[in-house]
Amino acid sequence: MELLVLNTDFESIAVIDTYESMIWTDRYNSYGDFEIFFAMDTQLLQYLKEDYYLWLKDSEHCMIIEDIKINADTEEGNHLIVTGRSLESILERRIIWGQRIFNGNLQNGIQTMLNECIISPSIADRKISNFVFVPSTDPKITRLKIDNQYTGDCLYDVIKGLCEENNIGFKIVLTDENEFAFSLYAGVDRSYEQTENPYVVFSPNFENIINSNYYSSRASFRNVTLVAGEGEGAARRTAIVGSASGLDRRELFTDARDISSDTEDGTLSDAEYMAQLRTKGLKNLADHIVTTAFEGEVEVTRLFKYGEDFFIGDIVQIANEYGNEGSAYISELVISNSEEGLSIYPTFKTISK
């Protein structure tokens, strides 16, 4: 499996096809990462440098080299370990500058964030000249709404959180014109819960799951939150989000004192402010749902092929030998290549509704 090395001018300077192991991870709504393990060769250091890029044919994501480590070991031999993250990590380099309220269409809101922080910011030094926004026409994206207030939040954390809340993905791909093209996208439903697309099923019955791990937990589940906003003591403004009673009620406190009714555009009405508190509460509850995950090494050369029959973010049908079955989306995919061969490990997550 070959890797292409690009310098900071996006010029191809080397092809890597000799290494002891490589782990390359793509993710649906967060940045991916990689690790490559080499037998030490000083020539590698000529083109494996921090801030250079790695491109893999089997992935649409491009990685940034961030860490280079040399291990000297008289018994095991000397090794070079190169690690880094995908282009999505660029968003960590910016914050929401000052106080901002985003209300209305979600995609438009994210585009505004990117315009103000990266594409056409008022502070020229914040601009990344080759960064562009590619709007989606998918109704799964265009119908989504936002009603949030931010002050100094990390841009990456904001976009990641919004995508996770709405079960959508985001990506930054390197185009043929050497642009960093940002876009939102939604996976295709290929489960038994729809009839428009061919089914993709991973199950022992189809002999396409080599091994699997199933995990389910309600330990951190919460369904009611008291959201406390601005003010002090008994005068602090609060909202209750969620409902349940008795033993089924699981409460959570949400500190929302960072949400202010006084904004750069004027004072929020009571209704507008309470809507902001409720949004904050819903986000906190979304971080405390029942956790269900299914990890497995799958056979991807015969029945269903990654990159042809299914992609990151797609909703597929999964089952294991113990009767755990349902639909879930592919949240990440690990490509592992070593002397033992090529393996692909997807992680499936249930959809929060």
Regions found by a protein language model. Give the residues of each.
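Short beta-strand-centered interaction patches in the first periplasmic/extracellular domains
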Residues: 69-91, 130-221
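Oligomerization/assembly interface segments of phage tail-like spikes and tubes
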Residues: 26-42, 78-90, 227, 288-302, ...
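Short beta-strand and beta-hairpin "edge-sheet" elements
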Residues: 54-85, 171, 315-347
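N-terminal "assembly arms/tails" that initiate or stabilize quaternary assembly
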Residues: 12-53
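Acidic, small/polar-enriched beta strand-loop surface segments
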Residues: 160, 190-290, 294, 301-340
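Surface-exposed cap/loop segments at beta↔alpha junctions
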Residues: 43-135
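Amphipathic, non-transmembrane alpha-helical segments in extracytoplasmic/periplasmic proteins
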Residues: 27, 35-36, 84, 99-132, ...
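Solvent-exposed edge beta-strands and adjacent loop segments
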Residues: 1-29, 203-215
